[in-house]
Amino acid sequence: MVGTGVLRDQPFFQARIAEAVALVRSARTWLHTVVHQAWTSTLTSGTASVAERADLLLAAVHATRSAADAVQLVYTVAGGTANYRHSALQRALRDVHAVTQHIGAAPQQYEEAGRMVLGLDPLQPIVLW
């Protein structure tokens, strides 16, 4: 029941924490995998392939968005105490959403990655490296 007892003892809170952990860990694992692949290719051939660069962009944006979603999940189920300025969740929510405002994590980056996945040239030269 909401509003009674310690949050960590509440099934709804436990479920949201598990969901948040899954979001972050899966996104982080994929990001580490594609970074390793691109790094290995760069060491071997001097450059990462277009497909590897598309994966790098997509994994980086996905990791950022997943982190924001995870914090939002926990913030939402934490209740009213998360709203106070002294709350660590309040700070985490502000920080993670500040990161999502960076051009590298903007939703438009999905368009760039999609172009590259489809074999089209990216519109932003920074993706070319």
Give the predicted meaning of each segment.
Residues 1-40:
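Extended amphipathic alpha-helical segments enriched in small hydrophobics
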Residues 33-36, 40, 58, 65, ...:
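Charged/polar, solvent-exposed surface patches and flexible loops
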Residues 18-25, 57, 61-68, 94-97, ...:
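Generic structural signal for well-ordered, non-transmembrane alpha-helical segments
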Residues 26-59, 72-83:
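C-terminal helix-coil-helix/basic helical segment that borders enzyme active sites and/or dimer interfaces
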Residues 17-20, 49, 56, 86-89:
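Hydrophobic packing residues in well-ordered alpha-helices of helical domains and bundles
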Residues 80-129:
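Glycine-rich phosphate/cofactor-binding loops in nucleotide/flavin-utilizing enzymes
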